């Protein structure tokens, strides 16, 4: 008998090679034995392994798409839309500091984007078994602990802040909402390509420096959480780096709010 773990790509590959070799050997011996015959269960993958494998491949990519779509629907309207309507001038003449205005914009847009992303995430979690054509007992979201969900929520939250910050800065350069949408397209392509990396390779990388790369760190952080292979220091690096990028983007946006050439063009 050949036992293997279908949730492990290396184990599955070795099983396929050995089964092929033994099948050929069996044929040369006039069918003296059969590989994995009978009703015994030879797949050693647990429900946790199966759930982790499928969720880690699909959900990081879907989450990034949902989060980006949610942020893209509101950020251009909030920045470029107000420039187009001329209402941004009312905000800029208030005694509020530009940095506070920029951070307020990012946080408020981030909350809306987060709610949009979470609603899409919950719907996807509930429908994924049917979408994958998998029996309901093969995947179970209850295999994840409260800690896993908290870490996932923190990664999602900081990712939304970075996304909103980047989209807000891009939108500030645009004169209209339509122009902002066109300028955002290259960033959308980059995020989509990065999101696909969750379906490639054999899990999240172990080296912490990968978790300093914007957007890629979030995808791999979510991948590690879903397949139970995450390291605490890597998740911390992901969260801290995202907060740093958010701070940098808010400072850039504040500088742009202080530029009449940009805001009144």
Identify the meaning behind each predicted range:
Residues 71-75, 123, 165-166, 249, ...:
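Hydrophobic/aromatic residues in alpha-helical transmembrane segments
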Residues 98-128, 239, 243:
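Selective transmembrane-helix segments that form parts of the transport pathway or gating/packing helices
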Residues 78, 169-175, 226, 242-265:
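Junction motif at the cytosolic side of a transmembrane helix
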Residues 1-70:
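Transport-system extracytoplasmic interface segments
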Residues 78, 84, 147-189:
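A structural motif at transmembrane helix-loop-helix junctions in multipass membrane proteins
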Residues 117-151, 164, 172-177, 220-229:
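Short helix-loop junctions at transmembrane helix boundaries
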Residues 177-212:
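Transmembrane helix segments
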Residues 72-94:
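Transmembrane helix boundary and interhelical loop/hinge segments in multi-pass membrane proteins
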């Amino acid at each position: 008998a050949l036992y293997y773990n279908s949730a492990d790509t290396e184990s599955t590959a070795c099983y396929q090679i050995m089964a092929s070799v033994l099948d050929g050997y069996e044929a040369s011996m006039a069918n003296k034995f059969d590989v994995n015959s009978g009703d015994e269960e030879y797949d050693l993958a647990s429900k946790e392994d199966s759930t982790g494998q499928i969720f880690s491949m699909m959900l990081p990519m879907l989450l990034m798409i949902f989060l980006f779509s949610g942020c893209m629907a509101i950020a251009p309207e909030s920045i470029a839309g107000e420039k187009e309507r001329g209402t941004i001038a009312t905000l800029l003449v208030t005694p509020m500091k530009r940095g506070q205005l920029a951070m307020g914009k990012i946080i408020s847009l981030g909350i809306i984007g987060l709610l949009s992303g979470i609603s899409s995430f919950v719907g996807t979690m509930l429908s994924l078994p049917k979408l994958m054509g998998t029996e309901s007992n093969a995947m179970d979201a209850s295999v994840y602990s409260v800690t896993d969900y908290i870490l996932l929520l923190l990664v999602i939250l900081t990712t939304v802040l970075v996304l909103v910050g980047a989209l807000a800065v891009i939108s500030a350069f645009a004169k209209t909402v339509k122009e902002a949408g066109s300028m955002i397209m290259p960033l959308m392509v980059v995020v989509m390509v990065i999101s696909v990396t969750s379906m490639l390779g054999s899990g999240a990388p172990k080296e912490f420096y990968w978790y300093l790369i914007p957007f890629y760190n979030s995808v791999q952080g979510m991948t590690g959480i879903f397949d139970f292979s995450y390291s605490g220091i890597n998740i911390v690096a992901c969260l801290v780096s995202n907060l740093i990028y958010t701070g940098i983007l808010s400072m850039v946006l504040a500088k742009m709010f202080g530029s009449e050439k940009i805001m009144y063009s």
